[in-house]
């Protein structure tokens, strides 16, 4: 579960390394985000020469959470870290590569480009 002020790792090559959650999008008063939800983030740490600069406010989609998500068959999937992918307005990734596994729940949110670029879909 991701809420305001949560720091996440960035799982793409857009240039950002770490981001801070500003807002969870999707309804008034929504407090937490899970895998597949869109959030507004501020870049706290970035690589030099990247597409995204430090201090920039961008949208991102959550791809991994420590708290995990419950599947319809009753199983849970949890990850070792909280991670996101920075996206454009058309839900496509700003970077050209995705690092690490992503959850299958991203297909339901129409993030097919992220799913196709990911090395592993769990």
Curated annotation (Swiss-Prot):
Belongs to the universal ribosomal protein uL14 family. It holds the Pfam family Ribosomal_L14. GO terms for biological process: translation. Keywords: Ribonucleoprotein, Ribosomal protein, RNA-binding, rRNA-binding. Binds to 23S rRNA. Forms part of two intersubunit bridges in the 70S ribosome. The lineage of its organism: Bacteria, Bacillati, Bacillota, Bacilli, Bacillales. Part of the 50S ribosomal subunit. Forms a cluster with proteins L3 and L19. In the 70S ribosome, L14 and L19 interact and together make contacts with the 16S rRNA in bridges B5 and B8. The keyword Ribonucleoprotein applies. PROSITE patterns: RIBOSOMAL_L14. This is Large ribosomal subunit protein uL14. One of its GO terms (cellular component) is cytosolic large ribosomal subunit. SUPFAM superfamilies: Ribosomal protein L14. The keyword RNA-binding applies. InterPro entries: Ribosomal_uL14, Ribosomal_uL14_bac-type, Ribosomal_uL14_CS, Ribosomal_uL14_sf. GO terms for molecular function: large ribosomal subunit rRNA binding; structural constituent of ribosome. The gene is rplN.
């Amino acid at each position: 579960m991701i809420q305001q002020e949560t720091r996440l790792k960035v799982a793409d090559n857009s240039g950002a390394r770490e981001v801070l959650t500003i807002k969870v999008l999707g309804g008034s008063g929504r407090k937490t985000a899970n895998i597949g939800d869109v959030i507004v983030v501020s870049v706290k740490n970035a690589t030099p020469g990247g597409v995204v600069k430090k201090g920039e406010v961008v949208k991102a989609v959550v791809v991994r959470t420590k708290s995990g998500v419950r599947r319809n068959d009753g199983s849970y999937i949890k990850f070792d870290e909280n991670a996101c992918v920075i996206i454009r307005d058309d839900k496509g990734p700003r970077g050209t590569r995705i690092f690490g596994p992503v959850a299958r729940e991203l297909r339901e949110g129409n993030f097919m480009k992220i799913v196709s670029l990911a090395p592993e879909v769990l």
